[in-house]
Amino acid sequence: MKTVVFAYHDMGCLGIEALLAAGYEISAIFTHTDNPGEKAFYGSVAHLAAERGIPVYAPDNVNHPLWVERIAQLSPEVIFSFYYRHLICDEILQLAPAGAFNLHGSLLPKYRGRAPLNWVLVNGETETGVTLHRMVKRADAGAIVAQLRVAIAPDDIAITLHHKLCHAARQLLEQTLPAIKHGNILEIAQRENEATCFGRRTPDDSFLEWHKPASVLHNMVRAVADPWPGAFSYVGNQKFTVWSSRVHPHASKAQPGSVISIAPLLIACGDGALEIVTGQAGDGITMQGSQLAQTLGLVQGSRLNSQPACTARRRTRVLILGVNGFIGNHLTERLLREDHYEVYGLDIGSDAISRFLNHPHFHFVEGDISIHSEWIEYHVKKCDVVLPLVAIATPIEYTRNPLRVFELDFEENLRIIRYCVKYRKRIIFPSTSEVYGMCSDKYFDEDHSNLIVGPVNKPRWIYSVSKQLLDRVIWAYGEKEGLQFTLFRPFNWMGPRLDNLNAARIGSSRAITQLILNLVEGSPIKLIDGGKQKRCFTDIRDGIEALYRIIENAGNRCDGEIINIGNPENEASIEELGEMLLASFEKHPLRHHFPPFAGFRVVESSSYYGKGYQDVEHRKPSIRNAHRCLDWEPKIDMQETIDETLDFFLRTVDLTDKPS
């Protein structure tokens, strides 16, 4: 049976050996070039392929159409993936009549995603395993073909568990590959309600947070022990690595991170104490705990910290342009809730941020980005993170003022992007779900969905293509000039302070604000083209939490990524949104102050938006990247968002001349 194999690491080597032993004909192997910054303790797939006389390739992008065509020419009957590190596109998966199968190092549906070996140890699991499953477009989500359980002993560390998983994988493949070859397999669908997903880990993720229980810190040490990069902490600015540890149920009133004793080297934790059995100062040699204490100059009562002392005192400076807007003011609130951010903001008004104006770590200037270019350039240079949130993002303006949309949304933002390139500053840029346009995919995927818009004589697409071109410019600056960036795409965020009722009166607002105005004024709710268009509505609190995690950027996981931020479970048509809003309005305690409901009225889009408008029938996000990069998923139900948004706007209405 002819196969093409995607493989890396020890699992890749043993998978290839198992295929050959089972009589498969391997036409080609795709692998990765080794990362010079990674300690290569594992077998080389490339060397094995060369020794076996099998063609081997390591393309940067195996999903490029040229590689898809070359793989198609190989006519594989079945495809296998053994620890290949990139997602394989659906076009390749569909090339094999018998399907494609992946070996994953966990008991799916638990621990989908990256680094399951390390994550199960971090989380203190007592059992894991290996799974062979059918590959589908979504990562690690296909039907299960076979599984083998592996017990995790209390003294297991990453390398010992790795060896156990390799042994289990050999057994699993020996048992299962002949059955696949003969088409004699039983597949079991994964239970989505039991699925968990974890993102990529980097060396920077393994810092020891001493306020946590000793058992949690010990699990971290186990999860990244040699040959992984190791868990680490700091004495002042001196970094040291902990290679092995033990938990002590030591009852101490000492502050977490305090040295309780030198021999053994005991550190107070949030609960109990951690004994550092072996460790390493800086780039030195490994030594036992008490010698490490001497090397670091520790004495009883010394304090350890999770980051360098000089870093701990420095607040991250965040520049938010458009700080008074919907996202800007909510993000400011979230950042100021923490104690390590300094927020600098510019906008043409301050009504939504008035509650922050006296905050010691909030600095605001009233101004226009098209005028205050010198102020902006200075603050881009001064700050660490830049969020240019200024844009015209209301559909009626796309047809009413297309040139103004282009000038503000594209030209002004391009200037800010170039400042970030010039001063080598990190930019977090608000793309938009509008860039997907009329895409027909069930889920809009950041890395694979096509971006489809209408003809030039439909000016409603000027916002979409302006944002898309900026996305591409930012991506190119990242590739060619090292710009540190993340693009995020909000999907219909809703909540208090979304637009205002005055904007709705002139038609320049988002859907829910316009509907609320209709209820407040007793005018009919207009359903554009029947209101059957579906959207996925996202609570502003869920959206801001995801955006906050992008700013935090744990382990630099968000660098160079495009991340949809939306709630695929909160899908509703505009008509359904109106009905839910009406039901909430009718039971609101202020309802009696407002006129009777005037009903729904169907209107044509051309009469409402003007000529040149086209609508999109559905817009549902894939949030795979948000899971992977942010460990995030939305939690808030749409009805709760509607209730809170309505309540906010009703309480802004002057009721003095309303009937009681």
Swiss-Prot record:
Binding site for UDP-alpha-D-glucuronate: 393, 398, 432-433, 460, 492, 526-535, 613
One BP annotation, GO: lipopolysaccharide biosynthetic process
InterPro entries: Arna-like_SDR_e, Bifun_polymyxin_resist_ArnA, Epimerase_deHydtase, Formyl_trans_C, Formyl_transf_N, Formyl_transf_N_sf, Formyl_transferase-like_C_sf, Lipid_A_modif_metabolic_enz
Reactions the enzyme catalyzes: UDP-alpha-D-glucuronate + NAD(+) = UDP-beta-L-threo-pentopyranos-4-ulose + CO2 + NADH; UDP-4-amino-4-deoxy-beta-L-arabinose + (6R)-10-formyltetrahydrofolate = UDP-4-deoxy-4-formamido-beta-L-arabinose + (6S)-5,6,7,8-tetrahydrofolate + H(+)
Domain of life: Bacteria
Pfam families in the cross-refs: Epimerase (PF01370), Formyl_trans_C (PF02911), Formyl_trans_N (PF00551)
Binding site for (6R)-10-formyltetrahydrofolate: H86, L87, I88, R114, V136, K137, R138, A139, D140
UniProt GO cellular component terms: membrane
Site-annotated residues for Raises pKa of active site His: D140
Positions that bind NAD(+): D347, D368, I369
Active site: residue positions: H104, E434, R619
Keywords: Antibiotic resistance, Lipid A biosynthesis, Lipid biosynthesis, Lipid metabolism, Lipopolysaccharide biosynthesis, Multifunctional enzyme, NAD, Oxidoreductase, Transferase
Coiled coil: none
Region Formyltransferase ArnAFT, annotated ranges: 1-304
Region (Dehydrogenase ArnADH): 314-660
Site label Transition state stabilizer, positions: N102
Gene Ontology MF terms in the entry: carboxy-lyase activity; UDP-4-amino-4-deoxy-L-arabinose formyltransferase activity; UDP-glucuronate dehydrogenase activity
The enzyme's E.C. designation: 2.1.2.13, 1.1.1.305
Cited HAMAP family: ArnA
Protein role: Bifunctional enzyme that catalyzes the oxidative decarboxylation of UDP-glucuronic acid (UDP-GlcUA) to UDP-4-keto-arabinose (UDP-Ara4O) and the addition of a formyl group to UDP-4-amino-4-deoxy-L-arabinose (UDP-L-Ara4N) to form UDP-L-4-formamido-arabinose (UDP-L-Ara4FN). The modified arabinose is attached to lipid A and is required for resistance to polymyxin and cationic antimicrobial peptides.
Family: In the N-terminal section; belongs to the Fmt family. UDP-L-Ara4N formyltransferase subfamily.
Quaternary structure (record): Homohexamer, formed by a dimer of trimers.
Protein name: Bifunctional polymyxin resistance protein ArnA
Species of origin: Escherichia coli O9:H4 (strain HS)
